């Protein structure tokens, strides 16, 4: 029994988290569209004061909930697409600076995934080799 308890204690469980910086572009877009950002944050369970702390973390399901509520508020399922199209690499701060230094698409994707894995925990992206293509 002691061995079983020790094995359970040794298992690492990773709490999926997202840095607040990942939702800031969404809040900017929502404000520009006239949506009540504070209300949406409150409904999702994200204290509005966290927007002043981009390196703070929120549970990933809470960030997803904010995204869902935001889509409903704007009447679109494509909010991420709209935000992505409206955001330049310059708008991503130091993360964008790293990506701007990429020479090839492959390098851009590898660095982008590396940065993503730094901003989001409990969820991982990677590239895998499938012959002459990557998936």
Model-derived features: where do they sit?
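N-terminal low-complexity or simple alpha-helical regulatory segments
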Residues: 1-134
């Amino acid at each position: 029994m002691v061995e079983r308890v020790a094995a359970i204690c040794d298992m690492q469980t990773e709490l999926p988290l997202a840095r607040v910086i990942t939702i800031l572009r969404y809040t900017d877009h929502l404000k520009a569209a006239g949506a009540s950002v504070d209300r949406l944050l409150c409904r999702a369970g994200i204290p509005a004061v966290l927007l002043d702390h981009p390196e703070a973390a929120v549970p990933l399901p809470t960030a997803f909930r904010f995204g869902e509520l935001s889509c409903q508020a704007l009447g679109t399922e494509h909010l991420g697409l709209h935000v992505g199209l409206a955001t330049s690499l310059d708008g991503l701060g130091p993360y964008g600076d790293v990506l701007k230094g990429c020479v090839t698409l492959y390098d851009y994707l590898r660095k982008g995934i590396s940065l993503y894995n730094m901003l989001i925990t409990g969820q991982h992206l990677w590239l895998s080799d499938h012959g002459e293509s990557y998936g």
